[in-house]
Regions:
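N-terminal anchoring/stem segment of glycosyltransferases
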Residues: 1-75, 89-94
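Catalytic core and acceptor-binding pocket of nucleotide-sugar-dependent glycosyltransferases
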Residues: 154-233
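Charged, glycine/proline-rich intrinsically disordered loops and linkers
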Residues: 135-162
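GT-A fold catalytic core of metal-dependent nucleotide-sugar glycosyltransferases
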Residues: 81-136
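Short catalytic/ligand-binding loop motif for oxyanion handling, primarily in non-cytosolic enzymes
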Residues: 15, 47-48, 107-110, 115, ...
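Residues that flank catalytic or metal-binding motifs in active/ligand-binding sites
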Residues: 80, 101-103, 174-175, 218
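Secondary-structure boundary elements
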Residues: 28-32, 89-97, 102-104, 182-189, ...
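A structural signal for well-ordered alpha-helical segments within the folded catalytic domains
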Residues: 17-20, 24, 78-82, 216-220, ...
Length: 233
């Protein structure tokens, strides 16, 4: 079993060159993890050209096609949650840790912090900016109240965290493009399942009049699923 498998989503033809840069950075700066496998989930409808396939040709890279409906593709960033679940399924039983990094990531020093300690089930990076995040100093608004209710989040699982740029202290809201989990926990599968249900749910339709709620719905559901799955302790 691998200690770590990395995963990065190829959502469009332009993804391949960026993922190649991520792969090269892992080789150059990955330290003891420089030979860790990389899985690349992609929609099965994506036309993977010979040129793009050649960019990622490596014994350490494995392409993972997955199904996603045209309706789902039309909803912003739904492909992230669905692709993460495909990666998790592909590495189940093959890795102790799955590190999910979107294509805009580069590794500049050993990513050994992604190797989770025995007592840790999930590691994350906070969101960069507050955007639709829930300010810690204020009660949760209607959107986050609905997220917590549908995801069955216990109130004592909430805690304060700063955004990356430290513009606010918010309730837990994780960057969907930089996270690590244990595949056997099925976290990404639950994320995908709940996202597919909730983005269609009438409770959330009114919020989508503001396009930011559409863009970050996948990330809000991720927060709800993580908080319902694990205790901060």
């Amino acid at each position: 079993m691998e200690q770590v498998i990395f995963a990065s989503l190829a959502a469009s033809p332009t993804s391949f060159r960026k993922i190649r840069m991520l792969l090269d950075s892992l080789k150059d700066f990955g330290g003891e993890l420089f030979r860790a496998p990389l899985v690349v989930p992609h929609p099965d409808s994506l036309d993977v050209t010979v040129e793009n396939a050649r960019l990622l040709k490596s014994p350490d890279v494995h392409m993972i096609p997955f199904r996603i409906s045209s309706e789902e593709m039309d909803f912003p960033l739904s492909v992230v949650a669905i692709g993460a679940a495909a990666a998790e399924k592909a590495v189940a039983g093959k890795a102790e840790n799955l590190v999910w990094l979107l294509e805009d990531t580069l590794v500049l020093k050993s990513p050994s912090a992604f190797v989770l300690p025995a007592s840790t089930q999930y590691a994350y990076r906070p969101v960069h900016h507050t955007k639709i995040g829930s300010l810690w100093k204020d009660p949760p608004d209607g959107f986050w109240t609905a997220i917590y209710r549908h995801c069955k989040v216990e109130p004592d699982h909430l805690f304060p965290m700063d955004t990356c740029v430290r513009d606010n202290t918010i309730r837990p809201y994780f960057n969907a493009g930089c996270q690590a989990t244990r595949p056997q926990n099925g976290l990404f599968s639950r994320w995908c399942e709940l996202f597919r249900s909730l983005y269609r749910h009438p409770d959330f339709k009114p919020f989508f009049a503001n396009p930011l709620y559409r863009v970050f719905m996948h990330q809000a559901v991720l927060a709800g699923v993580v908080l319902s799955s694990f205790s901060p302790a």
